[in-house]
């Protein structure tokens, strides 16, 4: 039996470990997320959070999440939003959403660190298939009575491919 030098063995282990990390890092994530910082943490009603994402797989269903980051000083337990989604070669369809962020009894929902809270809220009741492949546009405006709406740090949209069981 042949002896392997310790340095050769360490090199071999390092190369194998690095290759595994590289291969895991190259795995395609079936997720899109775009968050936009709200200027001065004062969300004006005419400031729209916009973006686009591409859908190639129309056979799979997706979950759509609203992602919102606010401070502990945010004055309300909810936020009203006007969310628009536009399919390729179609017009933008808007829906008004009352997003609950917390309650006086249980406090803020989501994850908090110090005085910053982030919440991800599922917008569709069940997984949604996109009927057309291509680029989808989204637009999000706050429609609260306060203008500007203070203490909102960022807002965005997350689209996740639903894994088949």
Which residue ranges define each predicted feature?
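Short amphipathic, basic-aromatic surface patches that mediate peripheral association
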Residues: 66-74
């Amino acid at each position: 039996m042949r002896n392997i030098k310790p340095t050769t063995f360490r090199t071999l282990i390092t190369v194998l470990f690095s290759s595994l990390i590289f291969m895991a890092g190259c795995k395609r994530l079936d997720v899109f997320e775009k968050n936009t910082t709200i200027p001065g943490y004062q969300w004006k009603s005419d400031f729209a959070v916009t973006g686009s994402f591409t859908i190639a797989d129309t056979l799979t269903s997706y979950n759509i999440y609203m992602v919102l980051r606010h401070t502990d000083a945010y004055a309300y337990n909810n936020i009203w939003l006007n969310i628009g989604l536009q399919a390729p070669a179609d017009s933008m369809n808007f829906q008004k959403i009352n997003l609950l962020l917390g309650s006086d009894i249980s406090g803020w929902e989501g994850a908090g660190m110090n005085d910053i809270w982030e919440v991800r809220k599922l917008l569709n009741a069940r997984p949604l298939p996109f009927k057309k492949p291509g680029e989808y546009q989204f637009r999000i405006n706050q429609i609260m009575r306060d203008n500007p709406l203070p203490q909102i740090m960022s807002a965005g949209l997350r689209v996740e491919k639903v894994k088949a069981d």
